[in-house]
Amino acid sequence: MSVKIRNIDLGDFPLLLAPMEDVSDPPFRALCKRHGADLMYTEFISSEGLIRDAAKSVQKLDIYEYERPIGIQIFGSEIESMRQTTEIVERTNPDIIDINYGCPVKKVACKGAGAGILQDIPKMVSMTQEIVKATKLPVTVKTRLGWDENTKYVVEVAERLQDVGIEAISIHGRTRKQMYKGDADWTLIAAVKNNPRMRIPVFGNGDISSPEKAVEYKNTYGV
């Protein structure tokens, strides 16, 4: 069954290029597109940087026709700044706007951005709702299982984000506390996918180190 984000048809087994700081720049995206990426995202872009018109942030808005479909990923800790950033990003005409609720690095999370917002789910939901309202483009989310072992609320969180209008969710199978240690827990990603209330595409992320591993996880977890 073909996977769609609104009118964007990604095929039966879509492969997404995850947004990675200092990695998923235009040359790297071109390489991935050539080798079959079905959907790509830019490096994440700071809302504060875009509003200040900082050169490094503005440069990351550069996208090219051959990259489509492509999403621009944004991050930030303030709802109003993220709303303004959404309006700026929409003017560059990407196919999707993606929200980063998953970056675990201290300089991002300690400010309440990225995975930091997993400590305040009501704010996460409110921010998402304002972003959805601010654009006509599809909005997607990248996140983690939770802040730590005791807050793995991703099944509920995914439902709430769907209810305020996101059109797909990508889940990294670790908590923020884990960073990139241990194994990604794909059973929880599968629980989101198999939740009968979920109507939007659910994508898994974490430990996919080869084409064979991607097929294995697809067959095992259905994600």
Where does each model-flagged region fall?
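Flavin-dependent oxidoreductase catalytic cores
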Residues: 1-223
